[in-house]
Amino acid sequence: MKRLIAAALAAGSLVAGSSAAQVALKPETPNLLFWSAEQQARWYPAMETVYQTRPIAAGDRVHALPLSGRTLDPVFTHAGRTWTVDEYMATYRVSGLLVIRDGRVLLEKYGLGRRPQDRWTSFSVAKSVTAILVGAAIQDGRIKSLQTPVTDILPELRGSAYDGVTLRQLLMMSSGVRWSEDYSDPNSDVAKGPTEGVKLAQGQPGLNPVVAYMRTLPRAHAPGTKFNYNTGETDLVGILLARAVGMGLADYASEKIWKPYGMEMEGAWVTDPGGLERGGCCISMTLRDYGRVGQFVLDEGVIDGHPVLPPGWALEATSKQIENGQAGYGYFWWMQPNGAYQATGIFGQSITTFREDRIIIVVNSAWPKSGGPDLRDGRTALINALRQAAIAPAP
């Protein structure tokens, strides 16, 4: 288990979920972890044609992202060679690259045949959006606080290892409940959980398969003491949130962010076998709408002077709350050694924010594998170069 966690941390994030965690529209759909390059380029922009999804409705207004009047074209070194932005995008299969500073676009580029109106899947970037919505639910009074026991909202978990676990501990990946996220092991929780959950939920109307499986797990550590990346638990937070607000996450995201903040296009959110949006995976949105998510958090969740999030929530969620063997972890947000906070998804999805510089860098990719130091380090070199170019005096 220690080896698994170390490898996953080195990759920057773990796999978003097994193929059985979402419902394919066609039974012959291959495991999304092993799609070919051609399948990635075709299906990442069109997940709603592959899996069951729910729409995130947009409104009439669009949050403006005006051009800054200057462009970025840094040259940087990585892996013993010099790179241009275009060379990086071609080599690392980047479909979208966006740099925003002070709400203005400094760079916007597309690859792999993607167009500005095309969406792209988020993988685990969805976790960070789920955390935003938890904050909105607290602001709305639909969740009392982060100290709310999980079993208060999901009483189906009473008598399980989740007794005494708080919502905050779930958001920190520190419930203490045993979980294995090893995709090479068919007996790991992340591999067998979705299928086993469906079996356990049969004959129990209203019981979500994720809840059915998670409540069978034993406790490994005292709650709040140890970080352990757990995609099943992020889906559990999504179920808890939907229960608290009385609607699906797609509808709540539309109500709290998409419509009032001004996303330019409808989003799509993949659902689990129980028909609920996955708190841990797979929202589809345009490149600029990824940038708007980053800007919304950077602006602390305030829309037209109206706070969508509790005071201080955005800062707290995107600051280190627990040690994780790297720079730290917040509430479904990763801290980075370069001082940024980041929403991260496998196969090269990220929203990186430098708070003090008010810079947001979005990268959407179709990496040939889910992650790894080589891929992560290349992206970090690109991001650092873009940041330096953005803060340099204009010519």
Language model: regions and residue ranges:
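Active-site Gly/Thr loop motif
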Residues: 208, 264-267, 312-361
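Active-site-proximal alpha-helical segments within enzyme catalytic domains
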Residues: 232-240, 279-302, 349-366
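A short acidic/small-residue loop/turn micro-motif
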Residues: 111-115, 119, 367-369
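N-terminal leader/targeting segments and the immediately adjacent pre-domain N-terminus
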Residues: 5, 17-115, 143, 172, ...
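Active-site helix/loop module of the DD-peptidase/beta-lactamase fold
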Residues: 121, 140-182, 216, 243-281, ...
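Bacterial N-terminal signal peptides that target proteins for export
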Residues: 1-8
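Active-site SXXK
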Residues: 103, 121-146, 170, 237-241, ...
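Catalytic-site signature segments of enzymes, centered on catalytic residues
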Residues: 116-117, 182-184, 195-274
